[in-house]
């Protein structure tokens, strides 16, 4: 019985690995934070934001995807017009690849944390995006 449980657990882990698509993308990383006095810090859909969350363009990265930065992993739960319009990439990109980059807005609990992270990391970086495989998940 114990062997069966271990085998089933191993198969589930393998299935999870097979059901995820992984891609790398050049991204312009911006930061945002909980604004003092605003009461709540919720995503566009009401999800309470925490430091493991980020905003993305849902046409390029599906909600629920994991975005892997060099120092952390975030879940795509939020969006915004500047992310969708890629304003930061178009404004700050010096090379064509930078101007074509996606924009990911990483959430932090405070302004100090957000600005400290932004000052110590490059504006453009390659991130890994792990998206669930819709076809396998929708069987």
Where are these regions (language model features)?
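Bacterial N-terminal signal peptides
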Residues: 6-15
């Amino acid at each position: 019985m114990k062997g069966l449980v271990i085998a089933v657990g191993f198969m589930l882990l393998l299935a999870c690995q097979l059901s995820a698509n992984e891609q790398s993308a050049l991204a312009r990383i911006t930061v945002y934070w909980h604004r003092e006095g605003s009461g709540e810090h919720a995503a566009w859909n009401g999800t309470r934001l925490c430091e493991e969350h980020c905003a993305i363009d849902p046409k390029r990265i599906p909600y629920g995807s994991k975005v892997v930065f060099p120092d952390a992993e975030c879940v795509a739960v939020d969006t915004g017009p500047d992310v969708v319009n890629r304003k930061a990439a178009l404004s700050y990109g010096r090379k064509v690849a930078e101007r074509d980059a996606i924009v990911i807005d990483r959430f932090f609990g405070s302004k100090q944390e957000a600005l400290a992270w932004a000052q110590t990391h490059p504006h453009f970086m390659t991130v890994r995006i792990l998206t669930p495989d819709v076809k396998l998940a929708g069987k």
